[in-house]
Design a protein with these regions (language model features):
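Short coil/turn connectors at secondary-structure junctions
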Residues: 5-9, 52-55, 78-83, 117-121, ...
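Conserved thiamine diphosphate
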Residues: 1-5, 104, 115-118, 122, ...
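Glycine-rich, anion-gripping cofactor-binding loops and their flanking helix/strand elements
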Residues: 62-153, 228-260, 272-276, 307, ...
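Phosphate/pyrophosphate-binding active-site segments
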Residues: 9, 13, 25, 126, ...
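Short, solvent-exposed amphipathic alpha-helical segments in soluble enzyme
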Residues: 1, 27-29, 68-81, 137-142, ...
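Cofactor-binding loop segments of dinucleotide-utilizing enzymes, especially the Rossmann-like FAD-
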Residues: 14-15, 61-62, 87-89, 127, ...
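Thiamine diphosphate
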Residues: 221-406
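Cofactor-pocket helix-loop regions in the catalytic cores of large enzyme subunits
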Residues: 2, 13-98, 175-243, 275, ...
Length: 406
């Protein structure tokens, strides 16, 4: 069952006496089943949609977000004019120089609606139709526009990569060159440190073949833009909205790939869920650089509190999302678990700390003291901007989306 399509995590429940009883005889491991590709008729119908001249987008997920799948999808896009998107929180996304770019659906539902509004067809490739992360008053949760038809290339038990290659052939794109971005790092930032400048410095200094575990929340909104043309890397994101998974995921990545540098980004609030991962990083001597983006607030939850209509929250309720009293000393927290750590509040200091961490193998922590903002906007203003997107012309809405969350 565990090896058959669609292979997923399985749980084996054993009786307690297995610990002291005689072991069973070894057996031959079963051969993993081979998943079929999508039916030829399905592929042909979707090829017709792609060749119809209508505005069409492919929404990618799962294993097709690795380089081979992205190259196949890019061939289709270059041949047919379709746009490429991926899930809000991809499990694993390969990206950077020489890997075709794919735009992530925005976390904020209002901005996701702006992204999808122009399309008449949405083709799902190992992905689900996008929905909002939470339910909001007077807002729809299903984000596909009413005028847009959804098509599904594969079912869960089918091989998405084989099916995507079949679609490449069906639209005669096998000899079409995928669009491959060149290496183009941003410059190192200067001046007062902000979350955007942290992301800029990462793009400027990221090592080749790195793995990024991104749980930066509101502070990481500029990371995709500043690392799009950085050296090739893997991005692991917050699947399922499980705040606190970022540091343990970084541990898992470093154990699985000991020859690759790992970068873990975490907000101060999310880092407190699983700070014991710092001890594991030291105990296992893992090559992980941890960046804590410390704005002394559960900023993402403050935004969501207002967006769900919880108006007039009292001081006691607000204090539960305030991390300034008492302030958390992440340097002391890391050092108490044996980790080299430093705190910075200037871009120059952050650049130097990140260069040193990447240069020296092993676990390091950098606490970046940053203001509570969203791409330069005070977070209090964000819900009001989002609420206005429905009432402005589409070109202006797109411009706002590109400015706030590129």
């Amino acid at each position: 069952v565990a090896a058959g399509p669609p292979a997923q995590i399985s749980t084996l429940i054993l009786p307690a006496d297995v610990s002291w009883s005689d072991g069973a005889a070894a057996t031959t491991a079963p051969t993993a089943g081979v998943s079929p590709a999508a039916a030829g008729e399905v592929v042909a119908n979707i090829a017709k949609v792609l060749n119809s001249g209508t505005k069409t987008a492919l929404l990618l997920g799962g294993r097709v977000l690795r380089e081979e799948g992205l190259r196949a999808a890019s061939r289709i896009a270059e041949k047919t004019g379709a746009r490429l998107f991926c899930e809000v929180f991809p499990t694993r996304l390969q990206r950077g120089a020489s890997v075709p770019h794919v735009e992530r659906i925005a976390y904020l539902a209002e901005m996701a609606s702006v992204q999808l509004e122009e399309f008449e067809n949405l083709i799902l490739v190992d992905a689900k139709a996008p929905v909002s992360f939470f339910a909001y008053p007077d807002k729809k949760s299903y984000l596909v526009p009413e005028h847009c038809t959804v098509h599904k290339l594969v079912e869960p038990e089918q091989d998405a990569l084989k099916s995507l290659h079949a679609l490449v052939d069906a639209v005669a794109a096998a000899h079409t060159q995928p669009k491959l971005p060149a290496l183009d790092r941003p410059s190192l930032p200067g001046g007062k440190l902000t979350a955007a400048k942290v992301c800029q410095a990462i793009g400027a200094l990221l090592p080749e073949n790195a793995i990024i575990s991104d749980e930066a929340q509101t502070s990481g909104v500029m990371l995709p833009a500043f690392t799009a043309n950085a050296p090739k890397h893997d991005l692991l994101t917050l699947t399922g909205g499980a705040i606190g998974q970022g540091l343990p995921v970084a541990v898992g990545a470093a154990v699985a790939c000991p020859d690759r540098p790992v970068l873990a980004l975490a907000g101060d609030g999310s880092a407190m869920y699983t700070n014991q991962a710092l001890w594991t990083m030291v105990n296992e001597d893992l090559d992980i650089t941890v960046i804590i983006l410390n704005n002394r607030s559960y900023a993402i939850l403050n935004v969501e509190l207002e967006r769900v209509g919880a108006e007039g929250a009292g001081s006691k309720a607000k204090s539960q999302l305030d991390l300034s009293e008492p302030p958390i000393d992440f340097v002391a927290l890391a050092q108490s678990q044996g980790m080299t750590a430093t705190s910075v509040s200037t871009s120059r200091g952050f650049n130097r700390a990140l260069e040193n961490a990447f240069r020296q193998p092993g676990p390091h922590l950098i606490e970046a003291i940053v203001p509570s903002e969203f791409k330069g906007l005070k977070l209090k203003a964000l819900p009001h901007i989002l609420g206005a997107l429905d009432s402005v012309p589409a070109p202006l809405a797109k411009a706002i989306k590109k400015k706030v969350a590129p």
